[in-house]
């Protein structure tokens, strides 16, 4: 039976989705399930790995049932995932020994500070392309081994496995056939040497993490395993593509040439520049990371990671109850000509690139008696654009490339106000693709390439379609005045920090 579709699992920070794509790269159907966010202490964020699995299984079942898809028509399954989020589970039982520690969580901050104080940052940066920060997986693993009784000894005996969410999903979907990850996810652990393309024994020794816990690292487009018999009506489907969410979006945006840049506006905000086969070291607080491994060759990227972006709208809705629906933010922001001088710095769990300060917290500046709800909401949306400008300026400096356009995706960029303001504050056109679900599309493309469903990257690039081009309309003087106000607000936020 001729395959017609590729299935993608997009396992995100707040929900899991299953999306089915046809050969043209169009969405045939999708399903989504949210799951609980666990906040044991301020600054800590956890997920129940079993609930993540349940949410994934539910979306797969719902999608195939509702669309009445014959599983024999599915060529392959691709996985994209929230990166850095860490799961440790029992090799024999498959049960996690602790909640997953989410990428946003700061609970391993003290471990990071010790590593910095002991002078390890330069070595870690040189080998991994990353900074020592609680954002990445390594210190999360160390925290779990320290806080679960007997975990260190069990890990040393080979009884425990570590993985990012992709590894956890493949292990379970395949019935334990494969303990694997891909280069893009491995590069986010703070344990992987991006130059030798292997787990770094010195870094493992530094954190006392047994190598036996770690997954095998493979290309981002290859057959890792097949789904276990009880899935998909006893028809095994090849699991053939894996990429961390931001690298998957870069692939889905067809940013295949050095210098091409995309920004994903999701829970966080993430800008990636493709740098080809060269690992460009940042001098401005950006990360050097692996974009993907394809056809036996690794390609690199520069990344600026912003911790809080679209989730600020969720905070307006659920925390402050200023809006009933996330979509209400666009209409409210449009009610006022500007933010009334208000700036929101959403450092709820610290500031990411290019500042990397985990000890600061969110702040609001410029409030007056005339500040209304619309000003507050507008300031929250504008904060996403200002943070992106911070990263873009650093990226241009590192790469020596003046950008001519930005390809944007993710749920928040469907907000026309945000898209237009982003183009204004950057001073370059923002291109929103016809299909904004580029993260899942990238995972589908990687899986489809592995099994011959798509023939080449050239075919994929030809399928990229434009929905709308947002040209900058703001005068340069006004743009720079607004941005200077943002920089002043950030400086004040950095001056007020917590222990």
Curated annotation (Swiss-Prot):
The lineage of its organism: Bacteria, Pseudomonadati, Pseudomonadota, Gammaproteobacteria, Lysobacterales. It comes from the Bacteria. It comes from Stenotrophomonas maltophilia (strain K279a). It is an enzyme of class 2 (transferase). Sn-glycerol 3-phosphate binds at residues 13, 83-84, 135, 245. Belongs to the FGGY kinase family. GO terms for cellular component: cytosol. Keywords: ATP-binding, Glycerol metabolism, Kinase, Nucleotide-binding, Transferase. One of its GO terms (molecular function) is ATP binding. ATP binds at residues 13-15, 267, 310, 314, 411. Gene3D superfamilies: 3.30.420.40. Inhibited by fructose 1,6-bisphosphate (FBP). Pfam families: FGGY_C, FGGY_N. Glycerol binds at residues 83-84, 135, 245-246. Signal peptide: none annotated. Pathway: Polyol metabolism; glycerol degradation via glycerol kinase pathway; sn-glycerol 3-phosphate from glycerol: step 1/1. HAMAP family: Glycerol_kin. PROSITE patterns: FGGY_KINASES_1, FGGY_KINASES_2. GO terms for biological process: glycerol catabolic process; glycerol metabolic process; glycerol-3-phosphate metabolic process. Key enzyme in the regulation of glycerol uptake and metabolism. Catalyzes the phosphorylation of glycerol to yield sn-glycerol 3-phosphate. This is Glycerol kinase. Its EC number is 2.7.1.30. ADP binds at residues 13, 17, 267, 310, 411, 415. InterPro entries: ATPase_NBD (IPR043129), Carb_kinase_FGGY (IPR000577), Carb_kinase_FGGY_CS (IPR018483), FGGY_C (IPR018485), FGGY_N (IPR018484), Glycerol_kin (IPR005999).
């Amino acid at each position: 039976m001729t395959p017609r579709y590729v299935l993608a699992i997009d396992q995100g920070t707040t929900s899991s989705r299953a999306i089915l794509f046809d050969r043209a790269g169009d969405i045939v159907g999708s399903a989504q399930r949210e799951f609980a966010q666990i906040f044991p202490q301020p600054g800590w964020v956890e997920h129940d790995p079993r609930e993540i699995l349940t949410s994934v299984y539910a979306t797969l079942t719902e999608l195939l049932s509702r669309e009445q898809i014959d599983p024999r028509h599915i060529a392959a399954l691709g996985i994209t995932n929230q990166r850095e989020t860490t799961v440790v589970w029992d090799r024999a039982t498959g049960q996690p020994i602790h909640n997953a520690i989410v990428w946003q969580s700061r609970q391993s901050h003290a471990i990071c500070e010790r590593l910095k104080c002991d002078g390890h940052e330069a070595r870690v940066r040189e080998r991994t392309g990353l900074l020592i920060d609680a954002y990445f997986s390594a210190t999360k693993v160390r925290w779990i081994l320290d806080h679960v009784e007997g975990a260190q000894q069990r890990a040393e005996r080979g009884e425990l496995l570590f993985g990012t969410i992709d590894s956890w999903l493949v292990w379970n979907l395949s019935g334990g056939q494969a303990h694997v990850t891909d280069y893009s996810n491995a590069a986010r652990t703070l344990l992987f040497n991006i130059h030798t393309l292997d787990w770094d024994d010195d870094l493992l020794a530094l954190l006392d993490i047994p190598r036996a816990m770690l997954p095998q690292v493979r290309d981002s487009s290859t057959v890792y395993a097949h789904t276990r018999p009880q899935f998909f009506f006893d028809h095994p489907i090849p699991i053939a593509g894996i990429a961390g969410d931001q690298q998957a979006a870069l692939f889905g945006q067809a940013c295949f040439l050095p210098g091409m840049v995309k920004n994903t506006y999701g829970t966080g905000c993430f800008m990636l520049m493709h740098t080809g086969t060269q690992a460009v070291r940042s001098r401005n607080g950006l990360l050097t990371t692996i974009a993907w491994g394809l056809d036996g060759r690794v390609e690199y990227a520069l990344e600026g990671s912003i911790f809080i972006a679209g989730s600020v709208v969720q905070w307006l809705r659920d925390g402050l109850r200023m809006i009933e629906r996330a979509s209400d933010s666009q209409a409210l922001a449009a009610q006022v000509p500007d933010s009334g001088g208000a700036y929101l710095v959403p450092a709820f769990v610290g500031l990411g690139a290019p500042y990397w300060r985990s000890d600061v917290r969110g702040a609001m500046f410029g409030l007056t008696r005339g500040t209304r709800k619309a000003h507050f909401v507008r300031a929250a949306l504008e904060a996403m654009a200002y943070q992106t400008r911070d990263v873009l300026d650093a990226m241009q400096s590192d790469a020596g490339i003046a950008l001519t356009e930005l390809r944007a995706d993710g749920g928040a960029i469907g907000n026309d106000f945000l898209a237009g303001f982003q183009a204004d504050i950057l001073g370059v056109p923002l291109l929103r693709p016809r299909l904004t679900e580029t993260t899942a599309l990238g995972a589908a493309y990687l899986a489809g390439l592995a099994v011959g469903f798509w023939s080449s990257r050239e075919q994929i690039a030809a399928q990229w379609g434009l929905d709308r081009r947002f040209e900058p309309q703001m005068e340069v003087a006004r743009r720079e005045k607004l941005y200077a106000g943002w920089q002043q607000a950030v400086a004040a936020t950095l001056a007020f920090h917590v222990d």
